Design a protein with these regions (language model features):
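Short glycine/serine/threonine-biased micro-segments
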Residues: 39, 52, 75
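Beta-hairpin "wing" of winged helix-turn-helix
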Residues: 51-66, 72
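Amphipathic alpha-helical dimerization/coiled-coil segments
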Residues: 1-2, 20, 75-92
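Short, hydrophobic-biased segments on the C-terminal half of alpha helices
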Residues: 47-48
C-alpha cells in the first residue's frame, strides 16, 4: 500500500468518511458531519485532502436554485480502503 494513502487513512475523520462512503452511493456534507462528528471547517479540510488524493469525488451542482454538493468514493478509494482494512486485519 502507498505510504501516503496509508497516512491519510490513519486520521479518524478521514477513516470514518471513507468507511461511510463505502456503504453508500453518494451522500451530502450534512450526512458526513453527522457520521464523523466533526466541525464544518475540519471536515472540509479532510474532504479536500481525500479528494486531492483521488480517494473521493466531489460533485457540485444546483438543485432547485440551491447549491448542492455530493460526495462519493472512487475506485481508487475503494481499493485503498480495502487494502488498508486487510492490512489492519493482518496485525493479529
Amino acid at each position: 500500500m502507498n505510504k501516503e494513502i496509508e497516512k491519510l487513512l490513519f486520521n479518524p475523520i478521514r477513516l470514518k468518511t471513507i468507511s461511510f462512503l463505502m456503504t453508500v452511493e453518494t451522500c451530502t456534507f450534512k450526512s458526513l458531519l453527522d457520521v464523523t462528528d466533526s466541525t464544518k471547517g475540519n471536515l472540509s479540510i479532510q474532504l479536500k485532502k481525500l479528494n486531492e488524493a483521488g480517494l473521493i469525488k466531489i460533485e457540485k451542482y444546483f438543485q432547485k436554485s440551491y447549491p448542492t454538493t455530493d460526495y462519493s468514493i472512487t475506485k481508487k478509494g475503494k481499493k485503498s480502503f480495502e487494502e488498508f482494512y486487510n492490512q489492519l486485519l493482518s496485525y493479529k
